[in-house]
């Protein structure tokens, strides 16, 4: 039930946060409009602590998708910029229950390799604004 709620939440938010797709840069990140599959990947990966790389110690819940870029490697790196709130326990991962929390922007990088059934949150860092 919570998974379905999260998908519905992010589907609406992705429409508001979509941007034009850019040209592919070899080895670099490319802008991408978030699809329902991308939202499902984000929700699945960030809701389960066992999908986090052991070096990722930042834990957040998610409010909105602000941006998405992808990079083709030996699989795909998805760099989601999200609005989220820090959480204390793994039970709070996924969509934020308290949508009035003091949120910030974060970059979440998820590595996906479908043919080996690999999904891993490789980093969560505060987003840096370029201005």
Curated annotation (Swiss-Prot):
Query: What GO MF terms are annotated?
Result: cysteine-type endopeptidase inhibitor activity; peptidase inhibitor activity
Q: Where is this site: Reactive site?
A: 27
Which stretch is the leader sequence? 1-22
User: Where is the motif Secondary area of contact annotated in this sequence?
Assistant: 71-75
List where in the cell it is found.
Answer: Secreted
Q: Which residues are glycosylated?
A: 33
Q: Which GO terms describe its cellular component?
A: extracellular region
Q: What disulfide bonds does the UniProt entry report for this chain?
A: none
Which UniProt keyword terms apply here?
A: Glycoprotein, Protease inhibitor, Secreted, Signal, Thiol protease inhibitor, Virulence
Xref: Gene3D superfamilies? 3.10.450.10
User: Could you name the domain of life of the organism this protein comes from?
Assistant: Eukaryota
InterPro entries according to UniProt = Cystatin_dom, Cystatin_sf
Query: Which function does this protein serve?
Result: Secreted effector that interacts with and inhibits host apoplastic pathogenesis-related papain-like cysteine proteases. Inhibition of host proteases by a pathogen extracellular protease inhibitor forms a specific type of defense-counterdefense mechanism between plants and microbial pathogens.
What family name appears in the similarity comment? Belongs to the cystatin family.
What is the name listed in the Swiss-Prot or TrEMBL entry for this protein? Cystatin-like cysteine protease inhibitor EPIC3
Encoding gene per record: EPIC3
């Amino acid at each position: 039930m919570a998974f379905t709620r999260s998908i519905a939440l992010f589907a609406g938010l992705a429409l508001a946060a979509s941007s034009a797709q850019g040209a592919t840069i070899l080895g670099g990140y490319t802008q991408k409009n978030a699809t329902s599959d991308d939202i499902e990947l984000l929700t699945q990966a960030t809701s389960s602590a066992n999908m986090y790389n052991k070096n990722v110690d930042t834990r957040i819940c998610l409010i909105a998708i602000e941006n998405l870029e992808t990079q083709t490697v030996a699989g795909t790196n998805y760099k989601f910029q999200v609005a989220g709130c820090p959480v204390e326990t793994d039970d709070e991962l996924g969509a934020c229950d308290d949508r009035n929390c003091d949120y910030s922007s974060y970059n979440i990088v998820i590595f996906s390799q479908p043919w080996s059934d690999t999904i891993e949150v490789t980093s969560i860092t505060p987003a840096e604004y370029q201005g």
